[in-house]
């Protein structure tokens, strides 16, 4: 689905449509896009905290959409992200190698 969202956002950037929210974001620039990513991520956290599955699903969809717009704006493709995920797959966490946090 991220690939589909990415392609749609890329198409909208290359073929602007008047009144498009996606074009509004591109016109406002990276700072606006990042602000929206942060806002939507916070709303996912709130939905999860409230154990509201509908809200979690809706807000996660919003996060994915805004991430796709951010990827287009920054020139990072879903394939780039997938390559990182594939490289990480199967690796053990290094949590046991980290120093214990004792000073809060």
From Swiss-Prot:
PANTHER family: HISTIDINE BIOSYNTHESIS BIFUNCTIONAL PROTEIN, HISTIDINE BIOSYNTHESIS BIFUNCTIONAL PROTEIN HISIE
Any one GO CC term of the record: cytoplasm
Enzyme Commission number(s) of this protein: 3.6.1.31
GO terms, molecular function: ATP binding; phosphoribosyl-ATP diphosphatase activity
Cellular location(s): Cytoplasm
Similarity annotation: Belongs to the PRA-PH family.
Gene that specifies this protein: hisE
Keywords assigned: Amino-acid biosynthesis, ATP-binding, Cytoplasm, Histidine biosynthesis, Hydrolase, Nucleotide-binding
Catalytic reaction list: 1-(5-phospho-beta-D-ribosyl)-ATP + H2O = 1-(5-phospho-beta-D-ribosyl)-5'-AMP + diphosphate + H(+)
Presence of keyword Cytoplasm: yes
Descriptive protein name: Phosphoribosyl-ATP pyrophosphatase
InterPro entries hit by this protein: HisE, PRib-ATP_PPHydrolase-like
Xref: HAMAP family: HisE (MF_01020)
Pathway this chain belongs to: Amino-acid biosynthesis; L-histidine biosynthesis; L-histidine from 5-phospho-alpha-D-ribose 1-diphosphate: step 2/9
GO biological process terms on file: L-histidine biosynthetic process
């Amino acid at each position: 689905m991220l690939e589909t969202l990415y392609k749609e956002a890329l198409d909208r950037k290359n073929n602007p449509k008047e009144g498009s929210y996606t074009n509004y974001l591109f016109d406002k620039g990276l700072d606006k896009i990042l602000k929206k990513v942060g806002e939507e991520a916070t709303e996912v956290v709130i939905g999860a905290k409230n154990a509201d599955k509908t809200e979690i699903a809706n807000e996660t969809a919003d996060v994915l959409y805004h991430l796709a717009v951010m990827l287009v704006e920054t020139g990072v493709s879903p394939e780039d992200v997938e390559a990182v995920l594939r490289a990480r797959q199967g690796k053990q966490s290094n949590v046991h190698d980290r120093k214990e946090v004792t000073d809060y």
